[in-house]
Amino acid sequence: MKAKAVRLHGANDLRLDKFELPEIKEDEILVKVVSDSVCMSTYKCAILGVNHKRVHEDVADHPAIMGHEMAGDIVKVGAKHQDKFKPGMKFTLQPALNYKGTMWSPGYSYEFFGGDTTYCIIPAEVMELGCLLEYKGKAYYEASLAEPMSCSIGAFNAAYHTHMGVYKHEMGIKKDGKLAILAGAGPMGLGALTYALHRDIRPKMVVVADVNQERLDRAAHLFPVEEAAADGIELHFVNTGKMEDPAAGLKEITGGTGFDDVFCYAPVEAVVELSSAVLGRDGCLNFFAGPTDKQFSARMNFYDVHYNSTHVMGTTGGNTDDMIESLRLTAENRIDPAVMITHIGGLNAAAETTLNLPKIPGGKKLIYTHLNMPLIALTDLREMGEKDDRYTALADIVDAHKGLWCPEAEEYLLAHFEQE
């Protein structure tokens, strides 16, 4: 079968290639990818090439398909998996395979397996690990976003707290505690926020701090503080760039106690140091954002580590249980991953979008892999409608949903735009 995909040939070398997929083996599955959301980790992979720990050294000879936040339809199933998977099933998958101790993952390491493609082959190890998941929901994008949501879910589940003299950790964020998300008004921060407000074990205070007022205003629009208060959560949106002393200002919001849980969503020295400075007693700092600099470092208050039991950790990705939780909470309408999406586009836009991701404002960029479409901000749909009525129809649907992408918008898009 012929496929078209964005593939990595080397550092800063992404190409939209057409190629022939081999026939699947008895332990493999052929799938049609419908949607793939672009991850900052994919940008890091693209600029580093073979210097990225998930990229094979022979990528120039065996280019790797980019993208790992994918969803689509199963097309053909190898004999070994026909009892569980059937053609026509919708799927998503957990890409953090960690297979036999390796770092290999779709979107980084595989020649015929990734998300920025029309079709791909899912290898045996994915099914062996239970990482291929049937998706029973309606919208493909919600299944794509289950992966980035699972990263934040995993971060919340990996947090831990202690009791003096007790050598056993209490896993998860502190119930009824005070939680901060620093550099938190970007797409991943908003994903963490929707989860913090609607998970089973919740904090009583959430502070979202950022230096981008436009992002903070959008976040406040999507998450009204009054609605959070009705659920018993005190929610604050704070621009630390306007504070003379951000650490003192954030601590003041907590009544001087500091935070029980702090999530750092930017690999920036000043943000990491601020995260350390606002920890309360037994505060857990999760350095969520992965740097590209292997020598990246920042100062941390080790007096507090010793005397106040503060601690630091980092998580990268979630696990299959986190993915399942994301899909469940989305199906129950408790979380809305669409808060992360600000742009849509076709496969033809994926390479340029990936290589320029830090320069493009807004949140998640959602790629529909069978469409030929430029990358378009949801806020620009109505302007695009001046030349094409279909964009006006999309703008009407999006505006009716608080400016968010939604199942109705995806359904209209896939029905009215030509697919390859």
Language model features with spans:
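NAD(P)H dinucleotide-binding glycine-rich loop of Rossmann-like/cofactor-binding domains
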Residues: 95-178
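C-terminal hydrophobic helical "lid"/dimerization subdomain
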Residues: 163, 221, 244-251, 270-277, ...
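ADP-ribose/adenylate-binding Rossmann-like module
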Residues: 261-268, 277-296
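Adenosine-nucleotide cofactor-binding segment
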Residues: 176-177, 182, 193, 197-271
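Hydrophobic/small residue at the entry helix of a nucleotide-binding pocket
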Residues: 151, 187-188, 215
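Glycine-rich Rossmann-fold phosphate-binding loop(s) that bind the pyrophosphate
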Residues: 148, 183-186
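Rossmann-fold NAD(P)-binding glycine/threonine-rich loop
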Residues: 270-273, 289-309
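Glycine-rich beta-strand-centered segment in the early N-terminal region that forms part
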Residues: 22-37, 51-100, 113-114
